[in-house]
Design a protein with these regions (language model features):
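Bacterial N-terminal signal peptides that target proteins for export
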Residues: 1-9
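N- or domain-start disorder-to-order transition segments that initiate the globular core
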Residues: 25-45
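Acidic/histidine-rich helix-loop elements
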Residues: 48-61
Length: 370
């Protein structure tokens, strides 16, 4: 009888252990793997920005120099942006019956990719494969850079094409080695603009002599977005949600668009400090996203919208992890809309070989020449 009682007690103890919260049983945490690394963890800096295409008309990309100088000092080995990769664009385009029209996100990219593929007589994947092979060689010649620009255009990677093109001497920016006159015009357009992809990512890659920039943006997750009409109606019926989305509540006014407008050179550093502060990350996540899934009026629609947002950010974090795989202990920089920053950093912190570099510390640093 005593043995039977002991057996029952042991079984009950096992059941109680299984019933405990996962945290109480010390669930596997990938981030703990960093403690056993044989070398320093790979560094990732996630720089949050307000999309510069939407900046006030007075904004001049030259105002960004204090930030750019510090980024040059950080000297990333790879640079990623919120642009979609050519591979994802092609996939969405192929599955447009399911995924929708990729052209609404990157119509010019798809158009020039089609033209370049026709001119070169290759497919997008073949163009990317050839570009990868050419980048593994010795220091590229002018002819190599022109060829790479053509291949990147065909692969749906116009910002990488611009990165190669702008590393050519102006006299070498010629329509040859696969570049047609039309392609020359288009690649030059992709290298001009005040949006952060061009004015920050491409400009920095050119200055550092990097071969390309990587698109980490995602719209595969759009397929799980809630019905737009129903979601819009639910939001319009929720003034408290609108106030948070517009950052019109007293606690959010400091983070509103007017407070963060880049309307003068001396506003750049304060705005970047705010957008990359933990306080902004928490407040913005609550206002834009968590509030949606906490609203009884939005119900399942709000939760579905947040699910799509999380899926989008998880995919972006995945791209960062893939791109950093070949550079263990190296440095990566992701330039992205500030709303993404807190989520992507949280997901990257779960990785076994990633450490997040502090943007506030970078902005507060005073490197020589900055």
């Amino acid at each position: 009888m005593t043995r039977r009682i002991r057996s029952i007690v042991a079984c009950a103890a096992a059941v109680m252990t299984l019933a405990q919260p996962i945290s109480a049983r010390q669930a596997f945490d990938p981030a703990r793997g960093r403690s056993g690394l044989i070398a320093p963890a790979t560094q990732v800096m996630v720089l949050g920005v307000s999309h510069l295409d939407n900046a006030p008309k007075a904004f001049d990309p030259a105002w960004l120099e204090p930030v750019m100088c510090r980024l040059r000092t950080y000297a990333p080995d790879v640079i990623l942006t919120e642009a979609m990769s050519g591979e994802q664009l092609a996939g969405i385009d192929a599955y447009k019956a399911v995924r929708g029209d990729a052209g609404k996100w990157a119509g010019p990219t798809l158009a020039i990719a089609g033209d370049a593929q026709a001119a070169l007589g290759i497919t997008g994947p073949d163009a990317m494969a050839q570009a990868n092979a050419l980048m593994t060689g010795s220091t590229p010649t002018a002819a190599d850079r022109r060829r790479l620009a053509a291949l990147f255009l065909a692969a749906g990677e116009p910002f990488s094409a611009a990165t190669q093109w702008l590393q050519l001497d102006p006299a070498e920016r010629l329509a040859r080695d696969g570049i047609t006159e039309t392609m020359k015009t288009k690649v030059e357009r992709f290298g001009i603009g005040r949006g952060e992809i061009v004015s920050m990512a491409v400009a920095l890659a050119v200055r550092l002599g990097l071969p390309r920039v990587y698109g980490a943006g995602d719209h595969l997750s759009d397929v799980v977005l809630p019905d737009n009409a129903a979601f819009g109606a639910a939001v319009r019926a929720s003034p408290e949600i609108i106030a948070q989305l517009d950052k019109a509540t007293p606690s959010l006014l400091f983070f509103g668009s007017k407070a963060l407008a880049l309307d003068a050179p001396d506003r750049v550093m304060p705005v970047f400090r705010t957008l990359n502060s933990p306080a902004f990350g928490k407040a913005d996540a609550q206002a834009q996203w968590l509030s949606l899934q906490q609203s009884p009026k939005l119900g399942a629609l709000g939760r579905q919208r947040v699910a799509a947002w999380e899926a989008q950010n998880l995919r972006m974090a995945t791209v960062v992890r893939e791109v950093t795989a070949p550079i263990p202990s190296g440095k990566a920089l992701l330039i992205v809309g500030a709303a993404h920053k807190a989520f992507i950093e949280a997901y990257l912190r779960m990785m076994t070989d990633i450490t997040i570099v502090s943007v506030p510390a970078m902005l507060d640093s005073r490197p020589t020449g900055c």
